[in-house]
């Protein structure tokens, strides 16, 4: 039973990541990669807007009963996000957060509402 629930959560996550990707592409961003895993954390989507790498966290909540999707991005998650982005930049481009043009966006889905896009979330 637990394995089925996990697969369902994974497939739901993949579904919302695909929706976020399509939404961002309609808004002019170019897709680079998805689900980049590192020991320090994971990157849901990596996009590009002009010369800027955009690291996107995709969040989904059926309701905000236990807090909104955006509120679920706590300090610990933010640090993992930064660490994973730094690792990706180094391994793929021999750059770092200090040398690359980059930003951190959120695309949040709440219930049946349209996606909420927050550019430069860590701004």
Curated annotation (Swiss-Prot):
<dbReference type="GO" id="GO:0003676">
    <property type="term" value="F:nucleic acid binding"/>
</dbReference>
<dbReference type="InterPro" id="IPR003509">
    <property type="entry name" value="UPF0102_YraN-like"/>
</dbReference>
<dbReference type="InterPro" id="IPR011856">
    <property type="entry name" value="tRNA_endonuc-like_dom_sf"/>
</dbReference>
<dbReference type="Pfam" id="PF02021">
    <property type="entry name" value="UPF0102"/>
</dbReference>
<comment type="similarity">
    <text>Belongs to the UPF0102 family.</text>
</comment>
<dbReference type="InterPro" id="IPR011335">
    <property type="entry name" value="Restrct_endonuc-II-like"/>
</dbReference>
<protein>
    <recommendedName>
        <fullName>UPF0102 protein APJL_1381</fullName>
    </recommendedName>
</protein>
